[in-house]
Amino acid sequence: MPNFSHKSQARQYSFERKIARNSAEFAKISEPYSSVVEETRTDKLVDTSSVHHVFLQKTGPCVEYKRHVEIPVDTSADATEETQWSLDIPWFGWIFRPLISRHIKHRHHKNRHPWWAPPQTFTAHETLVLALLAAASMVAAFINTLFTQTVAFAADEFGVSTTGQGVAAAIVRLGIVLAIPLAILGDRIGRQRVVIALAFIAPVLASLGALAPNFAALVGTQTIARPVGLALDVAVLVILIEEMPKHGRAYGLSVLALASGFGAGFAVAALPIADLGPTAWRFVYVLALIWLAVALSLRRRLTETPRFVAHRSEPKGSRRDTSRKTGITAPRTLLMVGAVAFLVNIFVATASIFQNRYLKDVRDYSATMVALFTLSTSTPAALGLIIGGKIADINGRRRVAALCIPLGAVLISLSF
């Protein structure tokens, strides 16, 4: 059973509507809905004046859900449908609560999922976990974007050349080796504990960049902070795979990517602060401490994955116990995915680290203009992430990757 004991903050909603007897919907009003919220009928009551149908949620994102249909015996009277539901979606409720509520108010029995919904219905627990993981992804994305966005401005203060910036970027990215043992800890002590710990540590380490007395110190702080952010990202992905339903994982990944865009976008949006003076870029690093609010939320509400709890009880030496400890279940697939990620990052890392320098020096953009450019070109991708994740769940991950990776590489190249 899902655990909602961690201070549920569900919001209550209700909606009532009249359904005319001569409408197409009236003929199916006593049937369960199956889009977004899958219903099950619990009661059919008959009194002298009306027939009553009561429906509860079988599977769906609502913490509580009840739909009551009253059909008067008087054939000239309209039917009444009253729906009550509650949603607990931390951090991203402002996006999904209106979408879900609007769907409930205007739905019909054609059983079509709206474009924004996952192809497989999520439970309330899965919805809560996805929202918390998305918040953690914002933290990781901000930390991982911070140095990339500010290095050009820090280099100006410290008098570092373009070559020096490239070397610094390589050093910071080589710190990824520090992320490996941190990520492995999730298999040893639990995913939840690792995610919560890293969500606290990463912002604090990143904020130390504001105190850097020289460029080397800045690089040193971010060489440690960035791997912690990457390890947080990995731990979040592990929980996502273990918690999300089979046909909803790509959708979940797309939501995490969308959240990562928000986190990175926050770093970009803060960039105009650098226009305030030669050392003003340091204040962008101070903003990392804001993300401790997410860490507190994770500590209060994120629970351990059932799969890890089950694996922890596996007999020592069993095949599943060995695969959990070594992390090796499909070496060929792991090698292929790793190779693709390596090649993609060779291209993306180089393009991202020098984009701001290109805009600043070649195009003569201010920090504000750099931020506006990045936000205006990246924001439309949010819609594509949701749609792409849904397509991947329906048509397969390989097809989407085979099309999007080369297409994205070509388009990024053309931007320069």
Residue ranges and their predicted role:
Residues 129-162, 348-356:
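Extracytoplasmic
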Residues 169-184, 237, 375-388:
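Central cavity-lining transmembrane alpha-helices of secondary-active solute carriers
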Residues 193-208, 399-414:
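Structural signature of the two symmetry-related core transmembrane helices
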Residues 210-221, 277-278, 416:
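Helix-loop junctions at membrane interfaces in 12-TM secondary transporters
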Residues 221-258:
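Cytoplasmic helix-loop-helix junction between adjacent transmembrane helices
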